[in-house]
Design a protein with these regions (language model features):
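Hydrophobic "anchor" residues
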Residues: 48, 126, 270, 297, ...
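Beta1/beta-strand and adjacent pyrophosphate-binding region of the FAD-binding site
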Residues: 1-12, 171-181
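Glycine-rich flavin
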Residues: 2-4, 21-27, 32-171, 199, ...
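FAD-site-proximal beta/loop scaffold in flavoenzymes
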Residues: 155-171, 256-329
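Flexible, glycine-rich terminal cap/loop adjacent to redox cofactors
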Residues: 7-35, 40, 47, 51-58, ...
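Gly/Ala-rich phosphate-binding loop of Rossmann-like dinucleotide-binding domains
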Residues: 19, 23, 188, 192-193
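Short hydrophobic core segments
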Residues: 7-9, 118, 133-143, 177-178, ...
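A Rossmann-like FAD-binding core segment of flavoenzymes
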Residues: 112-115, 119-127, 194-293, 298, ...
């Protein structure tokens, strides 16, 4: 049996980064991957979705060309099906077919890559097929998979998960998107921009239920303007196959929706089944494995977790951050994770971005807060861009005079919210933030009025 200092289950963003840095730190490392090195982000999620979202954004901008004075009359975006085929061809040209690059990095760094499914056999031993590997420390980084909701009849109708949609060349003429989170909103806008008749069904009263209501409402208006039929605060109760092979989805209010296909975007589940956690006495929670501030699985001395399976925030950048924390701790440096400023982004047009706590979350946690909100239309940059959809909201802890949350919607909001991300992480005083000189004309100017509101006590 081969013995390693560290064995990692899963070569996604957390596992891949961790394996390479640990090996460079003179640890003997084996990493076990059942699918592809690099995880889902680069192959079936983040990267292909952003390629298609960029194409969708350009098509939407064509409708604004006349308003901006760029052309004499409104431009026709042309046949959506043909355009989608071209966008898919570009997607497939950019997204790699295999994981050769990642596998070669492992080889260059001395990481042992083992293809297959790793299962915990007993403390200190992992099985892969007929082989056994010994470890001193085990890192579980198995990621997550799209949630399939328990709706009667779902197995009889043509469905996609988000992973399947983002790798398929198929262009449906009509589509029901189930789920109004980040993935559901992005995919709904992609297909609508190319001409698909899209209906989005969301069980919560608003889109993006974890975000500020005013931000979510602005996004809802934008999606409706794209022709997307939003059905909010309603659940699906039954699915059935129509005579023409499509979908009939029955809602709780007895409405029946029809479409060529149903796209499931209701969340993701941590991959914790069938990997032998019971052999270590580990019982996962609904969100995954519970970890301490060092990314160690609670109740375990030599078992760690990172990425989606740790249940903190299901983002690639969180997984990469976990890799840094895990590297430090497995090398004996005792570094604690700090999750106060994990940015979130929804790459729709307009873009939604947020960081830290919402106002509701802050109040629930006992903070006495002040809040501020400013529309982007109050900035010169919004005038030059012809932007009508946009807003910044800030949440401050009154007692300490620092930001603890921020949310934004507007062009490139993911970029200009970086100022708030840094301010929250570094606990920059509001007085100091107010003294920052911001270039004119930029969207960052919206911070000036918002910070003035906070210093004047906001709400």
């Amino acid at each position: 049996m081969q013995q390693f200092d560290v064995v990692i289950l899963g070569a996604g963003s957390a596992g891949e980064n961790l394996a390479n840095t640990l090996a460079q730190g003179s640890k003997s490392v084996a990493i076990i991957e059942e699918h592809r090195v690099g995880g889902e982000c680069g192959f079936v999620a983040c990267v292909p979705s952003k390629i298609l979202l960029r194409a969708a954004e350009v098509r939407l901008l064509l409708h604004e060309a006349h308003q901006l004075g760029a052309v004499a009359a409104s431009l026709d975006a042309g046949d959506g099906r043909a355009a989608y085929a071209r966008a898919v061809a570009r997607r497939d040209a950019i997204v790699p077919d295999d994981d050769g690059f990642g596998a070669q990095q492992f080889a260059d760094n001395g990481v042992t890559l083992i293809r297959g499914r790793g299962i915990i056999l007993r403390p200190g031993v992992i099985g892969v097929g007929d082989d056994e590997l010994g470890y001193t420390d085990l890192v579980i980084a198995t990621g997550s998979a799209p949630t399939v909701p328990p709706i009667p009849g779902l197995d009889t109708v043509p469905t996609w998960t988000s992973d399947q949609a983002l790798t398929s060349p198929e262009f449906p003429t009509s589509l029901i998107v189930m789920g109004g989170g980040a993935v559901g909103c992005e995919l709904a806008q992609i297909y609508a921009a190319f001409g698909t008749a899209v209906t989005l069904v969301q069980s919560a009263p608003q889109l993006l239920p974890q975000e500020e209501p005013k931000i979510a409402a602005i996004l809802a208006d934008a999606l409706r303007a794209n022709g997307i039929d939003l059905r909010l605060d309603v659940e699906a109760t039954k699915a059935s196959r129509t005579d023409d092979g499509g979908v009939a989805l029955t809602l709780k209010d007895s409405t029946i929706l029809h479409a060529e296909r149903l796209l499931l975007a209701v969340g993701r589940d941590p991959r914790v089944e069938g990997i032998g956690l019971d052999k270590l006495g580990i019982t996962p929670g609904e969100k995954g494995l519970e970890t301490d501030e060092y990314c160690r699985v609670r109740g375990q001395e030599h078992v760690w977790a990172g990425g989606d399976v740790a249940g903190i925030a299901p983002f690639t950048h969180t997984a990469s951050y976990h890799a840094k924390i895990l590297t430090a701790n497995l090398l004996g440096q005792h570094k604690q994770a700090d999750y106060r400023a994990i940015p979130r982004a929804v790459y729709t047009t307009p873009t939604v971005a947020s960081v830290g706590l919402t106002a509701a979350q802050a109040r629930e946690q006992g903070y006495t807060i002040s809040t501020a909100g400013v529309d982007l239309r109050d900035t010169a940059r919004a005038e030059t861009e012809g932007t009508t959809h946009g807003r910044l909201e800030l949440i401050a802890d009154k007692a300490r005079g620092i930001l603890i949350g921020a949310a934004a919607i507007g062009p490139h909001a993911d970029a200009w919210l970086g100022e708030a991300t840094l301010a929250i992480r570094a606990e920059v005083p509001l007085d100091l933030l107010s003294e920052v000189i911001r270039a004119f004309p930029t969207f960052n100017e919206v911070y000036v009025e918002a910070l003035d509101q906070l210093r004047g006590d906001g709400d």
